[in-house]
Amino acid sequence: MKSFPRLASTAFALLAMCGSLNAEPLKIAYSDWPGWVAWEIGVQKGWFKEAGVDVEFLWFDYVPSMDAYVSGKADAVCMTNGDALVTGATGKPSVAIIINDFSNGNDMIVAAPGIESIKDLKGKKVGLEEGFVSHLLLLTGLEKAGMKAEDVTIVNTPTNETPQVLASKAVDAIGAWQPNSGQALKVLPGSKPIFTSADAPGIIYDVLAVSPESLEKRKEDWMKVTRVWYRIADYMADEANLDDVLKILSARVKITPEEYEPFLKGTAILSLADALKRWDTAPGLGTIYGSSKVADDFNLRFKVYEKSQDAAKYLDPSFTKALAAEKAK
């Protein structure tokens, strides 16, 4: 008599799995950043299928990936916590369910030869994309150096054009993230990073941001995606897998593993335990809530949007916490 409930529960579980796999695939827009290219590991190894969820990853440049999300072409997008606020205030709200990483050196202020520190930028021109993370990074560097935003002149420059602009000597420094920051160092001999995200860890968190509608309709599928992500993070944390990780990630962006390795070093991929700490609500850059408050203040100051955004509406730690509870059993 006891076997019937067990058989019934097994049947229901199989039906649920089949239903998930037969549903429309979850569509995730992603772009060229190590913490997001890392999803490719799960794709290549078939881990999403093993988890019982169908996911389609859509490759874009960064800004077009957010545009795709806003226009409804994707259910989720990989973006920074600060840009999630901008996207929500000006286009479409989202909810971050995974903190993939924080930038740990890949975002840089790269200066021309002869400029040795942030203080040397006084009265100089800096090329960067106004209102984006590189702008926030520069302001953070200026503040740490006891300077003001008015001490430099911002030349609004698309991030992917910053290497050429620095090489042309139209500006004295640029703000960009990898691979553009690295390219800037290559094209102008003698240039150097004078401030990076490693000098302000937590200024930029990288997240998986999901549409509230998709999250409500397919919560269990997004939980499966969360499980796969932390399987990826664990795989990346094992030094024995480094060659395979570099091979997979570099192939996605069409460069060599040797060229890709510095990008990986400048990205702090978060383990489950690390992520739980970053989901704390304490102020400061050590948490995503504190970091998002800094980003919100920046966005208001530079009129990226007019009304303050409540970070709590954009962040949902429950998926990470639920996985931690599963693993603790």
For the regions a protein language model found, what residue spans apply to each?
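Conserved C-terminal helix/tail region of periplasmic/extracytoplasmic solute-binding proteins
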Residues: 291-329
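Short, glycine-/small- and polar/acidic-enriched structural segments
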Residues: 24-165, 172-178, 194-195, 202
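Predominant activation on well-ordered alpha-helical scaffold segments within soluble catalytic domains
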Residues: 40, 85, 139, 182-185, ...
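Bacterial N-terminal signal peptides that target proteins for export
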Residues: 1-9
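Secondary-structure end/capping motifs
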Residues: 216-304
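Sec/Tat signal peptide C-region and signal peptidase I cleavage site
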Residues: 17-23
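Cleavable N-terminal signal peptides
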Residues: 10-11, 21
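Pocket-lining segment of extracytoplasmic ligand-binding domains
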Residues: 81-83, 154-155, 161-257
